[in-house]
Amino acid sequence: MSSNPELKYTGKVKVATVQAEPVILDADATIDKAIGFIEEAAKNGAEFLAFPEVWIPGYPYWAWIGDVKWAVSDFIPKYHENSLTLGDDRMRRLQLAARQNNIALVMGYSEKDGASRYLSQVFIDQNGDIVANRRKLKPTHVERTIYGEGNGTDFLTHDFGFGRVGGLNCWEHFQPLSKYMMYSLNEQIHVASWPAMFALTPDVHQLSVEANDTVTRSYAIEGQTFVLASTHVIGKATQDLFAGDDDAKRALLPLGQGWARIYGPDGKSLAEPLPEDAEGLLYAELDLEQIILAKAAADPAGHYSRPDVLSLKIDTRNHTPVQYITADGRTSLNSNSRVENYRLHQLADIEKYENAEAATLPLDAPAPAPAPEQKSGRAKAEA
């Protein structure tokens, strides 16, 4: 990907990242809690706020600690009911809060599309507009019993004015090719959305806070980007819901396990961590000039690359389960983003416009129903 000539590496921005337990399996109550964090961050001068992986309506810890029959019968219907559709009435509450508080945010949520779900991050700007939406490319291990996969359109960044922001979920930070793709997009601020980590360790050290904090910090060093790690906390409500009186399950979901962090482009810690069982926000002021200093020595997708020897290929088209072949032989396969389709559907709900770029529904208007043909689109990468 070529660099953006308008991309600036000057200026400072105050940011915040969340460490907190959602109101598990209750989207409306979790959004209430999110709005509280949005208002708090804005009041303290932050221009950007990062939320954890599928914070709405919560991370499905049940998939790791019990059998499939128990998980499906006890949790899946309610989880689906409390998942969000892109731009629905519940998401519009977040949009309105962003606009009223003049703050941009990335929210991790369970996105439902028909009867399927996806591990998604929605990007909402200071005006309350949805500017991007991405899905986790490959859900991890038992997550694949709950969520579908993303595709090549899900590698993206968005310039919010104060900096170019991208994001990945959880163990996407273990994927070298995915990380390299993000580095190539000249990401300046990276949202690393995580759940709380849980006690399958020491048998599985990869799931420990230590291991996952290590790859998060490494992302900052490798990509020379600021990283905001946002994480859940396992509270008593989560533990009681998923473990009940089962001592073995409770041992797998110990209280706490929060580990929000903010790192500089050289890997330096920029904020004092909260206690693992505490809820709250971490703050830092980011100086974008520090990226230039870090990249002077190593820019893996720039001067420190060898594309004549090693290169990455990515297909950014939407590969949908059904493709319609027209009379002239063309198919419906394209790179149209899900956000673009959402805006087009907004227009159809207002009136007929030929220019689809200018119009949006007022945030206090009811959200339009999702268009049936929007089955698998995602926001495409900005070069």
From Swiss-Prot:
Organism: Rhodococcus rhodochrous
EC number of the protein: 3.5.5.7
SUPFAM superfamilies referenced in this protein's UniProt entry, alphabetically: Carbon-nitrogen hydrolase
Keyword Hydrolase: yes
Domain CN hydrolase span(s) in chain numbering: 13-288
Protein name: Aliphatic nitrilase
Annotated spans, Disordered: 359-383
Job description of the protein: Acts on aliphatic nitriles such as acrylonitrile, crotononitrile and glutaronitrile.
Pfam families membership: CN_hydrolase
Domain of life (superkingdom): Bacteria
Catalytic activity as recorded in UniProt: an aliphatic nitrile + 2 H2O = a carboxylate + NH4(+)
